[in-house]
């Protein structure tokens, strides 16, 4: 308490004593009064005094106020007064207009009161429970008090909330509050809660924070919204920055797609308010958080692809090429586009296709490079363009080739109507502005990064320096400017370009050494004792000379490795050379540039090193040091071993290619076998359908035959019923003649039916052709068996190829062992003969195994040829099956035609039978008219046989009776 009293300093005793007594009396009322109204009025009075007499109220009343929160929860009014009073005691916001010393004292006072409050963790838990109250007068001051506690002692309060049951979940409900004041202050509370605490960030994210925050941003109008949008964006950054789990959750939840409307800035005349600029700036930063180069590569790549697929990258490029965009927004947009396309081939290709809305249209890359080499543009904008160009070329060999091609003579526009990227880079490289020199040199170096092909292509570039003089190569022009003693920034940029160009490119080293003035210039620069400003240039010259030694293929007799090392030892000294080489990594700006890919410098004079170049220095510094101290014999042995290993690599690569080709051939054969199998199945299906159709025709024929038999029986019954008793002789004679005629017709019909039966029998015999179908099915089965055999043989070939791959792996392992033994040999000269014997033995062994592999490959080719012949035979068999099926189809058509004819003839027979039935019916009617009884149809059927017998015994009996 004494410390807290001392914070406010010495003040007049009179008033302080009076206010202290008043505060004491109010505290006594709060503690001892039994009436709720008295306690409420006392707390309200303490609230009014707490802003002016913060120390006194805090010292005397804090304990009583906490007790009120515990005991009087049923009365929201007194709880609200108590929370407001505690907020006034702990918060420092009211002290902003006080002098600086007083402000510092008040901040200490707020921290002390916060420490007293959270000393009992139950107080924070109590405050969290009060936030569940929906009453505005309780929830709002509770939110403000907890926010103030987090601002004062954030980590301690975060830990208490983290271990409290449902602590974070209670706070998440604030985002769903319908009262904007509470919702907005809830966002501020979550900002303070999630700052620098990954565990709380994960809990908040999985409590559906992303969905709620994005909804608030959308409701408030996206970038056109107010400060609430700004607060939500800051909270989103807290949740996502350096938190891989939340970033992955954000991407998988498809929240990246919801960011696209943020960048629909609309009409350029709509204006850019300060709040809109701030909001858009934070939105761009949030995109960069998701694709930051410091994130895991897999997470960054997936976010980049999602941004392209949902159209976010396209929207950013629209802002990039728009007019009227504020400078800081344009700069941040360039940086954002840079990281969205960095290392992503699809995004880089799209960016290369973007054109500026000019007449004629120009590529966006060209427009940006024009800004980079223009010294009148802001420094931060030029840095952003350089970063964008670097990201466009990062791991993009296609883009590197396109940039270098604009420098080659065959692609330069002779009319001069358009400016290419290469022309702009050359213009910047040889400009009078040192910053343009440095930017152009670094940009061109990135076009050569890890791309030996483009390094060789760039050697073809010729520059016309002046009228009447022959053209000069770009490499020579760079060394000429370097030797003219220009500004340090220019020389550093050119030296970085030359080091990048010559590394891993012996042809470029040869071109560089071919100019006799280059080596003396470098040795002279290194040997001189210059000031601290020139030490960096000396270190870069030493690095360039070391690269010329390490990547030298000894094609120039006057500048072979050994001669260059002797020159260094004679003119510079090896120790001095290594010391100068170490100046690079010891420079204060080297470590700053090595941290991040983005060229972020406070001012132009700090723009010295490039991030990718620092990686090159780290890679080459050690090997150059070793190369300087190596003897000529060690170099020769190392070269021989390298050549041997290269030969082995070439042989292994050759056989890998052969095996790859064989794999392709086998895959083609598999596809062909699969195709033949499908065709065979189709043919079998067709044959089955034909057999079923023929069976249907047979069934139809049998049915027709049965129907014809029934019709004949019915006709016989009618004819026999015509023999009646009691008919006149002339009538009987006439009837007999008619019956005879009907019999003749019946015999004629019977003969026709017999012919039809014979025809149908022929049809039955023709159905024996179905055996051909069975034979075709047998052929198909044989085809299936042959296909299975082919599959088995292909599997055997595949296993043989796998064994060859294992052999090649063994060869690679032995090659690695050879390399290790060679390095061991380089360290120990005494075992020279033994090492050479081992290498020769291993080489012979490798060649023997490779010969065996070649023989096996030849056998595989023969087997593949045999498979091709078998496939041809299968195809011929399938063709014969097709012809058989065609014959079956023809015979089936003939059968169908004959069956149709037989149906027509049967219809004619039925018509004749109907006529006969009509005649018989008329005869029966005549007999009835004559008075002779006529038997019914059933009686006739039952007595057919008896009537036939009577007629045969006494044909004249009926006449006698009459």
Curated annotation (Swiss-Prot):
Chief location of this protein within or outside the cell: cytoplasm
Post-translational events: Phosphorylated in a cell cycle-specific manner; phosphorylated in interphase but not in mitotic cells. Dephosphorylated protein associates with the Golgi membrane; phosphorylation promotes dissociation.
Modified residues (N6-acetyllysine): 202
Zinc listed as a keyword: no
Keywords attached to this entry: Acetylation, Coiled coil, Cytoplasm, ER-Golgi transport, Golgi apparatus, Membrane, Phosphoprotein, Protein transport, Repeat, Transport
Coiled-coil ranges from the UniProt annotation: 638-930
A Pfam family it matches: Uso1_p115_C
Phosphoserine modifications at: 50, 942, 952
Protein name, entry field: General vesicular transport factor p115
Family affiliation: Belongs to the VDP/USO1/EDE1 family.
Positions of region (Disordered): 763-783, 926-962
Compartment(s) of residence: Cytoplasm, Cytosol; Golgi apparatus membrane
Spans of repeat ARM: 20-60, 61-121, 123-163, 166-207, 208-253, 255-310, 311-354, 363-408, 420-459, 473-513, 518-571, 573-630
Annotated GO CC locations: cytosol; endoplasmic reticulum; ER to Golgi transport vesicle membrane; fibrillar center; Golgi apparatus; Golgi membrane; Golgi stack; membrane
Classification lineage: Eukaryota, Metazoa, Chordata, Craniata, Vertebrata
Species whose genome carries this gene: Homo sapiens (Human)
Start-end of Acidic residues biased regions: 935-953
Domain notes: Composed of a globular head, an elongated tail (coiled-coil) and a highly acidic C-terminal domain.
PROSITE patterns referenced in this protein's UniProt entry, alphabetically: ARM_REPEAT
Superkingdom of source: Eukaryota
Functional note: General vesicular transport factor required for intercisternal transport in the Golgi stack; it is required for transcytotic fusion and/or subsequent binding of the vesicles to the target membrane. May well act as a vesicular anchor by interacting with the target membrane and holding the vesicular and target membranes in proximity.
